[in-house]
């Protein structure tokens, strides 16, 4: 049987009040299947009709429709699960996470990959919110869900305890952000996440003598934990308010970082900073990456002003805003203390939204 043809006319969307009756039929089918298979995860009390109704009202209920018929249901939540705080085990980090609960597939669509497809759509919903932790739990006797979790690359993290002393296995996985091209063949850019801390730290640590000349923060970065703390401080901020840190990559190799800093959303202004490893310089990477972020900031994020600050002696860094049409507004005298103990003047450049329309 060709599953591709069967699922080609599917629509994934938020559940609506009009879907409730059909969803409840699917929940009943799922309960009956669990009973046949000897799983005790769901019973006559859970999930209740009122729970499904609340999912829909809060916007956490999602469905797959085949034509006009709902064939899969699940709840995608970002509100946290209280029992996860007392896990007998350990989560990778304490950043915001996404959970899928109450996943059920209509009998006529079973064995067609619908549950897996729902989970992958949930990952996309999470990416759009800038949340990259995915947590789930399931009963020890729910072999179907355990197989699904394993096929999606989740890692076991411990046990959680629900009502009635119901102990479940807990799992988590990292959802990696999508990568984007930015005008240089073979290179990509994406948001840096907690799991990148190790490779970022290693890259900085191996190039300390070079990077510390113009990047005073390097001397304060002493461990992977320091980098994890830095990334966490960004990732815990809601996506629409976040100063995103991006990795420039060639394949799976890090080339450098670029990102927004000190954004003032009330006045629609932000700042861009960047650094590149020595072996990737001179290829136009930073110029193209800064151009990419400028378009993102001015055309999509609602900023009106972008600022770049460069030490006067850092010729390569100054060349970036100059090349991209930034205006030099002036120089901050003794604007930064370098690692040699000397102050350096800082050139200040700006680009306004109206500048790119001229």
Regions found by a protein language model. Name each.
Residues 1-8, 16-39, 43-44, 50-53, ...:
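A short, well-structured alpha-helix characteristic of acyl/acetyltransferase catalytic modules
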Residues 15, 103-105, 138, 276:
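Hydrophobic adenine-recognition pocket in adenosine-nucleotide-binding enzymes
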Residues 22-25, 51, 117, 121, ...:
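Alpha-helical elements of Rossmann-like donor-binding domains used by nucleotide-donor carbohydrate transfer enzymes
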Residues 41-65, 221-241:
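Active-site rim helix/loop that mediates acceptor-substrate recognition in acyltransferases
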Residues 49-50, 85-92, 158-159, 233-235, ...:
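Short, P/G- and charge-enriched loop/turn segments at secondary-structure junctions
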Residues 63, 69-78, 99, 104, ...:
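Conserved beta-strand in the GNAT
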Residues 75-104, 110, 268:
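Conserved acyl-donor/pantetheine-binding loop and adjacent beta-alpha core of acyl/acetyltransferases
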Residues 116, 124-133, 141-144, 160-161, ...:
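Acyl-donor (CoA/ACP) binding surface of acyl/acetyltransferases
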């Amino acid at each position: 049987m060709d599953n591709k043809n069967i699922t080609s006319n599917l629509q994934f969307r938020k559940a609506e009040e009009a879907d409730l009756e059909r969803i409840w039929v699917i929940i009943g089918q799922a309960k009956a299947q669990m009973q046949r298979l000897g799983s005790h995860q769901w019973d006559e009390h859970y999930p209740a009709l009122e729970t499904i109704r609340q999912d829909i009202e809060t916007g956490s209920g999602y469905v797959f429709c085949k034509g006009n018929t709902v064939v899969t249901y699940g709840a995608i939540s970002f509100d946290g699960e209280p029992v996860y705080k007392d896990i007998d085990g350990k989560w990778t980090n304490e950043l915001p996470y996404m959970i899928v609960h109450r996943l059920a597939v209509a009998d006529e669509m079973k064995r067609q990959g619908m549950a897996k497809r729902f989970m992958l759509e949930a990952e996309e919903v999470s990416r759009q919110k800038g949340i990259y932790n995915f947590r789930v739990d399931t009963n020890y006797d729910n072999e179907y869900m355990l197989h699904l979790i394993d096929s999606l690359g989740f890692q076991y993290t411990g046990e959680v305890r629900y009502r009635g002393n119901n102990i479940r296995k807990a799992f988590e996985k990292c959802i990696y952000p999508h990568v984007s091209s930015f005008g240089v063949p073979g290179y990509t850019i994406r948001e840096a996440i907690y799991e990148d801390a190790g490779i970022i730290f290693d890259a900085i640590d191996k190039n300390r003598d070079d990077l510390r000349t113009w990047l005073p923060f390097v001397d304060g970065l002493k461990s992977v934990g320091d980098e994890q703390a830095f990334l966490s401080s960004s990732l815990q901020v809601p996506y629409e308010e976040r100063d995103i840190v991006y990795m420039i990559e060639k394949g799976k190799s890090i080339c450098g970082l670029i990102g927004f800093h000190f954004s003032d959303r009330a006045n629609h202004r932000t700042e861009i900073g960047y650094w590149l490893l020595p072996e990737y310089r001179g290829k136009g990477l930073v110029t193209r990456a800064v151009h990419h972020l400028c378009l993102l900031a001015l055309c999509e994020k609602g900023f009106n002003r972008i600022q770049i600050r460069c030490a006067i002696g850092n010729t390569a860094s100054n060349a970036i805003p100059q090349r991209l049409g930034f205006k030099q507004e002036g120089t901050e005298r003794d604007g930064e203390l370098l690692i040699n103990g000397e102050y350096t003047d800082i050139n200040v450049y700006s680009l306004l939204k109206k500048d790119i329309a001229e």
